[in-house]
Protein backbone atom coordinates (compact mmCIF):
# COMPACT_ATOMS: atom_id res chain seq x y z
CA UNK A 1 0.00 0.00 0.00
CA UNK A 2 1.43 3.37 -1.04
CA UNK A 3 1.64 5.86 1.83
CA UNK A 4 0.60 9.00 -0.02
CA UNK A 5 0.78 11.18 3.09
CA UNK A 6 4.39 10.27 3.82
CA UNK A 7 5.39 10.56 0.17
CA UNK A 8 3.74 13.95 -0.16
CA UNK A 9 5.45 15.26 2.95
CA UNK A 10 8.83 14.16 1.59
CA UNK A 11 8.15 15.81 -1.76
CA UNK A 12 7.14 19.06 -0.08
CA UNK A 13 10.30 18.99 2.03
CA UNK A 14 12.43 18.41 -1.06
CA UNK A 15 10.71 21.26 -2.91
CA UNK A 16 11.35 23.60 0.01
CA UNK A 17 15.00 22.56 0.33
CA UNK A 18 15.65 23.01 -3.40
CA UNK A 19 14.07 26.46 -3.40
CA UNK A 20 15.97 27.55 -0.31
CA UNK A 21 19.30 26.40 -1.78
CA UNK A 22 18.99 29.11 -4.42
CA UNK A 23 17.35 31.75 -2.24
CA UNK A 24 13.82 31.23 -3.54
CA UNK A 25 10.59 31.19 -1.57
CA UNK A 26 9.15 27.63 -1.73
CA UNK A 27 5.70 29.21 -2.06
CA UNK A 28 6.73 30.30 -5.58
CA UNK A 29 6.61 26.64 -6.68
CA UNK A 30 3.27 24.99 -7.47
CA UNK A 31 3.16 21.23 -7.06
CA UNK A 32 0.99 19.61 -9.73
CA UNK A 33 0.25 16.00 -8.80
CA UNK A 34 0.17 13.98 -12.02
CA UNK A 35 -2.53 11.34 -11.73
CA UNK A 36 -2.31 9.49 -15.04
CA UNK A 37 -3.75 5.95 -14.55
CA UNK A 38 -4.69 6.65 -10.92
CA UNK A 39 -8.41 6.42 -10.04
CA UNK A 40 -10.55 9.15 -8.47
CA UNK A 41 -10.27 7.67 -4.98
CA UNK A 42 -6.50 8.11 -5.05
CA UNK A 43 -6.89 11.70 -6.18
CA UNK A 44 -9.41 12.30 -3.43
CA UNK A 45 -6.96 10.99 -0.84
CA UNK A 46 -4.35 13.47 -2.09
CA UNK A 47 -6.95 16.24 -2.09
CA UNK A 48 -7.71 15.52 1.55
CA UNK A 49 -4.00 15.99 2.27
CA UNK A 50 -4.20 19.52 0.89
CA UNK A 51 -3.33 19.13 -2.80
CA UNK A 52 -5.43 21.25 -5.14
CA UNK A 53 -3.50 21.08 -8.44
CA UNK A 54 -3.74 17.86 -10.45
CA UNK A 55 -2.39 17.02 -13.89
CA UNK A 56 -3.69 14.61 -16.50
CA UNK A 57 -2.04 13.48 -19.73
CA UNK A 58 -5.11 12.40 -21.68
CA UNK A 59 -8.46 14.04 -22.30
CA UNK A 60 -10.35 10.73 -22.25
CA UNK A 61 -8.96 9.71 -18.89
CA UNK A 62 -9.58 13.11 -17.34
CA UNK A 63 -13.20 13.00 -18.50
CA UNK A 64 -13.81 10.05 -16.20
CA UNK A 65 -12.38 11.82 -13.17
CA UNK A 66 -13.08 15.55 -13.21
CA UNK A 67 -16.81 15.27 -12.55
CA UNK A 68 -16.25 12.84 -9.69
CA UNK A 69 -14.03 15.16 -7.68
CA UNK A 70 -14.32 18.49 -5.83
CA UNK A 71 -14.93 21.58 -7.92
CA UNK A 72 -12.12 23.61 -6.36
CA UNK A 73 -9.45 21.41 -7.95
CA UNK A 74 -7.35 23.13 -10.62
CA UNK A 75 -6.92 20.69 -13.50
CA UNK A 76 -3.77 20.92 -15.63
CA UNK A 77 -3.50 19.33 -19.08
CA UNK A 78 0.14 18.25 -19.11
CA UNK A 79 0.20 15.77 -22.01
CA UNK A 80 0.21 16.22 -25.76
CA UNK A 81 -3.14 17.60 -26.91
CA UNK A 82 -4.55 16.75 -30.33
CA UNK A 83 -6.36 19.63 -32.01
CA UNK A 84 -9.49 17.54 -32.48
CA UNK A 85 -9.76 17.16 -28.71
CA UNK A 86 -9.50 20.87 -27.97
CA UNK A 87 -13.21 21.32 -27.31
CA UNK A 88 -13.26 18.61 -24.67
CA UNK A 89 -10.08 19.99 -23.14
CA UNK A 90 -11.72 23.40 -22.74
CA UNK A 91 -14.56 21.76 -20.82
CA UNK A 92 -12.26 19.77 -18.52
CA UNK A 93 -9.10 21.75 -17.84
CA UNK A 94 -8.24 25.05 -16.19
CA UNK A 95 -4.84 25.41 -17.88
CA UNK A 96 -3.09 23.70 -20.80
CA UNK A 97 0.69 23.23 -20.51
CA UNK A 98 1.26 21.76 -23.96
CA UNK A 99 0.41 24.31 -26.65
CA UNK A 100 2.97 23.42 -29.31
CA UNK A 101 1.42 24.86 -32.47
CA UNK A 102 -0.69 27.80 -33.55
CA UNK A 103 -3.48 25.56 -34.88
CA UNK A 104 -4.10 24.19 -31.39
CA UNK A 105 -4.14 27.69 -29.88
CA UNK A 106 -6.68 28.79 -32.49
CA UNK A 107 -8.97 25.88 -31.69
CA UNK A 108 -8.72 26.47 -27.95
CA UNK A 109 -9.54 30.13 -28.56
CA UNK A 110 -12.59 29.25 -30.64
CA UNK A 111 -14.05 26.85 -28.10
CA UNK A 112 -13.26 29.17 -25.20
CA UNK A 113 -15.07 31.98 -26.99
CA UNK A 114 -18.15 29.79 -27.35
CA UNK A 115 -18.07 29.11 -23.62
CA UNK A 116 -17.31 32.67 -22.56
CA UNK A 117 -13.97 31.92 -20.93
CA UNK A 118 -10.26 32.55 -21.38
CA UNK A 119 -7.77 29.68 -21.16
CA UNK A 120 -4.34 30.20 -19.60
CA UNK A 121 -1.77 28.29 -21.65
CA UNK A 122 1.91 27.47 -21.56
CA UNK A 123 3.90 27.07 -24.76
CA UNK A 124 5.70 23.74 -24.95
CA UNK A 125 9.31 24.09 -26.10
CA UNK A 126 11.59 21.26 -27.20
CA UNK A 127 14.82 22.32 -25.53
CA UNK A 128 16.64 18.98 -25.69
CA UNK A 129 16.28 18.60 -29.45
CA UNK A 130 15.06 15.00 -29.13
CA UNK A 131 12.93 13.93 -32.08
CA UNK A 132 10.59 12.11 -29.70
CA UNK A 133 9.65 15.32 -27.88
CA UNK A 134 6.83 17.67 -28.83
CA UNK A 135 7.20 21.42 -28.70
CA UNK A 136 8.45 24.44 -30.59
CA UNK A 137 12.14 23.79 -31.37
CA UNK A 138 14.23 26.09 -29.23
CA UNK A 139 16.72 26.46 -32.08
CA UNK A 140 14.08 28.03 -34.35
CA UNK A 141 13.48 31.28 -32.51
CA UNK A 142 11.92 33.00 -35.52
CA UNK A 143 9.18 30.38 -35.78
CA UNK A 144 8.51 30.55 -32.05
CA UNK A 145 8.31 34.33 -32.01
CA UNK A 146 6.01 34.35 -35.03
CA UNK A 147 3.77 31.84 -33.29
CA UNK A 148 3.69 33.92 -30.12
CA UNK A 149 2.79 37.03 -32.09
CA UNK A 150 -0.11 35.18 -33.70
CA UNK A 151 -1.33 33.61 -30.46
CA UNK A 152 -1.33 37.04 -28.85
CA UNK A 153 -4.05 38.08 -31.30
CA UNK A 154 -6.39 35.41 -29.91
CA UNK A 155 -8.63 37.01 -27.26
CA UNK A 156 -9.60 33.85 -25.39
CA UNK A 157 -6.13 32.30 -24.96
CA UNK A 158 -3.65 33.86 -22.53
CA UNK A 159 0.04 32.91 -22.63
CA UNK A 160 1.38 32.57 -19.09
CA UNK A 161 4.73 30.90 -19.65
CA UNK A 162 6.66 27.95 -21.02
CA UNK A 163 6.83 24.20 -20.48
CA UNK A 164 9.44 21.60 -21.38
CA UNK A 165 10.13 17.90 -20.95
CA UNK A 166 13.70 17.00 -20.06
CA UNK A 167 15.29 13.84 -21.45
CA UNK A 168 15.35 10.73 -19.28
CA UNK A 169 18.81 10.71 -17.71
CA UNK A 170 20.50 8.70 -14.96
CA UNK A 171 21.87 11.81 -13.25
CA UNK A 172 19.42 14.72 -12.70
CA UNK A 173 22.33 17.13 -13.17
CA UNK A 174 22.36 16.13 -16.84
CA UNK A 175 18.92 17.73 -17.18
CA UNK A 176 20.12 21.07 -15.80
CA UNK A 177 21.11 22.54 -19.22
CA UNK A 178 17.57 21.89 -20.48
CA UNK A 179 15.96 23.67 -17.55
CA UNK A 180 18.45 26.52 -17.73
CA UNK A 181 17.80 26.80 -21.46
CA UNK A 182 14.07 27.22 -20.89
CA UNK A 183 14.65 29.87 -18.24
CA UNK A 184 17.00 31.81 -20.50
CA UNK A 185 14.49 31.58 -23.33
CA UNK A 186 11.77 32.90 -21.02
CA UNK A 187 13.99 35.83 -20.08
CA UNK A 188 14.63 36.64 -23.74
CA UNK A 189 10.95 36.37 -24.63
CA UNK A 190 10.03 38.63 -21.71
CA UNK A 191 12.13 41.34 -23.35
CA UNK A 192 10.72 40.63 -26.81
CA UNK A 193 7.08 40.40 -25.64
CA UNK A 194 6.78 42.59 -22.53
CA UNK A 195 2.99 42.58 -22.81
CA UNK A 196 2.99 38.94 -21.68
CA UNK A 197 3.23 38.13 -17.99
CA UNK A 198 5.68 35.23 -18.24
CA UNK A 199 4.65 33.84 -14.86
CA UNK A 200 5.39 30.18 -15.27
CA UNK A 201 8.14 27.74 -16.09
CA UNK A 202 6.60 24.26 -15.99
CA UNK A 203 9.54 21.89 -15.80
CA UNK A 204 10.74 19.07 -13.61
CA UNK A 205 9.23 15.71 -12.73
CA UNK A 206 9.88 12.99 -10.14
CA UNK A 207 13.48 12.30 -11.13
CA UNK A 208 14.70 15.86 -11.66
CA UNK A 209 12.36 18.37 -10.02
CA UNK A 210 14.92 19.64 -7.52
CA UNK A 211 17.30 20.67 -10.30
CA UNK A 212 14.38 22.28 -12.15
CA UNK A 213 13.49 24.34 -9.09
CA UNK A 214 17.10 25.45 -8.73
CA UNK A 215 16.88 26.66 -12.35
CA UNK A 216 13.65 28.59 -11.81
CA UNK A 217 10.70 26.21 -12.18
CA UNK A 218 7.43 27.65 -10.89
CA UNK A 219 5.45 24.46 -11.60
CA UNK A 220 6.72 20.92 -11.07
CA UNK A 221 4.76 17.92 -12.36
CA UNK A 222 5.16 14.98 -10.00
CA UNK A 223 3.44 11.61 -10.06
CA UNK A 224 5.52 8.62 -9.04
CA UNK A 225 7.17 10.27 -6.02
CA UNK A 226 3.69 10.82 -4.55
CA UNK A 227 1.57 7.93 -5.80
CA UNK A 228 4.11 5.21 -6.48
CA UNK A 229 4.29 3.40 -9.83
CA UNK A 230 1.44 4.02 -12.23
CA UNK A 231 -1.44 1.61 -11.99
CA UNK A 232 -2.99 -0.18 -14.92
CA UNK A 233 -6.27 0.89 -16.43
Predicted regions and their residues:
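Conserved alpha/beta-domain cores
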Residues: 1-209, 213-215, 227-229
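Gly/Pro- and small hydrophobic-enriched strand-loop and loop-to-helix capping segments
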Residues: 217-233
Amino acid sequence: MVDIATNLQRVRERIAAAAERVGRDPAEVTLVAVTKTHPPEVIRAAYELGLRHFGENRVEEAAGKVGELPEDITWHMVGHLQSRKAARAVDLFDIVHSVDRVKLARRLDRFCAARGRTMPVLLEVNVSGEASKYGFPIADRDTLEAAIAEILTLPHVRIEGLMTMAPIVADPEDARPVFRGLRELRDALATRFPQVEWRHLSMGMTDDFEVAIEEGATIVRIGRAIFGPRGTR
